[in-house]
């Protein structure tokens, strides 16, 4: 069996795991930080360094939230293989069924050492703990007016894995693609140079078992991925942008055909 590819975000992920240790049995990692956990092909392009730690958290049987697209502030390091994206915040998705449950969740966050961010221009959902900045967003758009529709089923279907001696829950690859596609259309505004699209391509390229996993996924998820992949494959802007999300050496550029072939298979699965 080939060794797993190197995960440049492992140190960042471990630091967040330790900070969230009391909640590890109730959280699931999602978003950019999960990319390195989903890439299994050592021949794929290196995973980009994101500085983000994305997790879904359940504080009680009816309350959950996800730390999505989160970023721990670190000094930039320029690896030769891929650029570094250093942001400064962690976005969290809240699976609270009501505003009252959101209030309870906020109290729990204070108990974990987080506090509301009072900086000018900070969104209402922002929390901080040391260098960790957390945007706590709901899965129910009625609570604060925004969400990603795939976070709730992603939490319900999270899988277990181990890292640094800790057992953690991670979003599955099919739901990872769905959440990233939703973000690509939303915050990404269909920008073909976005990090959401980059993460999508990285997982499609680096996970040979993806097509079989989608085949076993719920019908609504299969259809969504099929429709979205079909739309991308018919878009000249996407086809032109694809090589730019791979390394520029000849071997990496040849993997563009692998990505397109795998996406075509996902279209057929729907």
Regions found by a protein language model. Give the residues of each.
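Compositionally biased terminal segments of proteins
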Residues: 1-270
